[in-house]
Curated annotation (Swiss-Prot):
Catalytic activity: 2 Fe(2+) + NADP(+) + H(+) = 2 Fe(3+) + NADPH; 2 Cu(+) + NADP(+) + H(+) = 2 Cu(2+) + NADPH
UniProtKB keywords: Cell membrane, Copper, Endosome, FAD, Flavoprotein, Golgi apparatus, Heme, Ion transport, Iron, Iron transport, Membrane, Metal-binding, NADP, Oxidoreductase, Transmembrane, Transmembrane helix, Transport
Residues reported in the UniProt entry to bind Fe(3+): 217, 307
SUPFAM superfamilies: NAD(P)-binding Rossmann-fold domains
Record carries keyword Metal-binding: yes
Annotated positions binding heme b: 304, 397
Cofactor: FAD; heme b
Membrane topology annotation: Multi-pass membrane protein
Superkingdom of this protein's organism: Eukaryota
Span of domain Ferric oxidoreductase: 247-395
Name assigned to this protein: Metalloreductase STEAP4
Expressing tissues: Expressed in white and brown adipose tissues cells, as well as in muscle and liver cells. Detected in joints and spleens of arthritic mice.
Homology family: Belongs to the STEAP family.
Amino acid sequence: MEKAHADEFPLTTDSSEKQGVVCIFGTGDFGKSLGLKMLQCGYSIVFGSRNPQVSSLLPRGAEVLSYSEAASKSDIIILAMHREHYDSLTELVDYLKGKVLVDVSNNRKINQYPESNAEYLAQLEPGAHVVKAFNTISAWALQSGTLDASRQVFVCGNDSKAKQRVMDIARTLGLTPLDQGSLMAASEIENYPLQLFPMWRFPFYLSSVLCVFFFVYCAIREVIYPYVNGKTDATYRLAISIPNRVFPITALILLALVYLPGILAAILQLYRGTKYRRFPNWLDHWMLCRKQLGLVALGFAFLHVIYTLVIPIRYYVRWRLRNATITQALTNKDSPFITSYAWINDSYLALGILGFFLFLLLGITSLPSVSNMVNWREFRFVQSKLGYLTLVLCTAHTLVYGGKRFLSPSILRWSLPSAYILALVIPCAVLVLKCILIMPCIDKTLTRIRQGWERNSKYTQSALNGKSDI
């Protein structure tokens, strides 16, 4: 038996083939854009309008009729109109009976109404088969053809045959339909386009708080303190020096916070003796935001690298170097080469370079195009094993940078330690807790729990009852 080549099978239906008649209620931007796209894919389009005589700028080849006349032309009607105009459809109950009504509308706010637009439409037209679809596609994307970033179409409805017909239309348009179940999912589908970075809010807020706190903290130590004690103007540090302390500190803390929720979850499972209990909402949301926390941390690490690269061209640095050279020439004295200082300097630079390289690797593997090409074990190895190695290298980079100054009273300003000492608290705590959890006696118990073993049967009973200790 001969094997057929993949290129012998078309990915989408041939656009030259006649696909049937589809009716679109509404001649706005979305209705016209969707109609044009469907015409290009071989469909015959009939627009329904309140004023068919004055409708203009419609795709060539489309027919414009009144709502009742257009409804009689097709079994599938796409409602490209807002919810506020659904009441006008009550006059067309007889015309819409048995038809497939595709609701593409969105609201202005999340959960604006008690029920979804699709469910509201189903109440108005009980004899029709309402399907929610195409609300995640913009009119601009349909017109320009840039559908790569929004190719997925969520579809839901109570009638499986009606859903299948709508999904066939989506495939013909080159889209990827995803069946979301019954019409009860319409509310979630309608809320999806209205979300504004839901998983990024916590990382942004947290990073903003950390940046502001450490910026003010460093400004007190490095700008306000010298001015109060010696009338020295060090405000120039606000542009480069202080941000170049704040950015790596924020990056290190955020990186540690990526792995802290996993440790807390392990401790919680050990305490409960079972995995069949939901985590607290705050911990659950924190774990869902780990990827975003890591990417924000990578962004701050990038800023640290860029700010470090511009250090040699700063006026302050060039002035110090020039002044030191002139002073040595006038006094005829040179500074001795100290091998230990060279080791410390090169070590913290090497640790920083290696840490940033692995940080980049973590960021690259978190991209969907890359993560989809590796299996779960490979992804877990990179994000977990190499992730902790990255945290170790970045923490060691900061420790070596501090050197002996940790124990020196001279770094205190108004009894305030250097900012990098505060930055090491969370990363060191995470690494210490991780070392405890990987001890054989603890790791063996944790592995058994995650494989389904339970220490006490009462946890199973309370889990079934939906109770929580925390």
